[in-house]
Amino acid sequence: DCRWFLGGCSKDSDCCKHLACRIDGYIKYCAWDGTF
């Protein structure tokens, strides 16, 4: 299962299509990767 927007992740492949794993301090979450 992939992680949806703002879901926790450790790498880009954890996230659903068009989402990438972002690191903000100690928090890692899936955010839009800019693709359609």
Curated annotation (Swiss-Prot):
Its main location: secreted. Neurotoxin that selectively increases Nav1.8/SCN10A peak current (EC(50)=894 nM) and causes a large hyperpolarising shift in both the voltage-dependence of activation and steady-state fast inactivation. Acts by binding to the domain II S3-S4 extracellular loop of the channel. In vivo, causes spontaneous pain behaviors (that gradually subsides over 30 minutes) when intraplantarly injected into mice. It is found in: Secreted. Disulfide bonds join 2-16, 9-21, 15-30. The presence of a 'disulfide through disulfide knot' structurally defines this protein as a knottin. Expressed by the venom gland. Keywords: Amidation, Disulfide bond, Ion channel impairing toxin, Knottin, Neurotoxin, Secreted, Toxin, Voltage-gated sodium channel impairing toxin. GO terms for cellular component: extracellular region. This is Beta-theraphotoxin-Eo1a. The modification Phenylalanine amide is found at residue 36. Negative results: has no inhibitory activity on the late current size of Kv2.1/KCNB1 potassium channel but does slow its kinetics of activation. Also shows minimal activity at TRPV1. It comes from Encyocratella olivacea (Tanzanian black and olive baboon spider). One of its GO terms (molecular function) is sodium channel regulator activity. The keyword Nucleotide-binding does not apply. It comes from the Eukaryota. Belongs to the neurotoxin 10 (Hwtx-1) family. 62 (Vatx) subfamily.
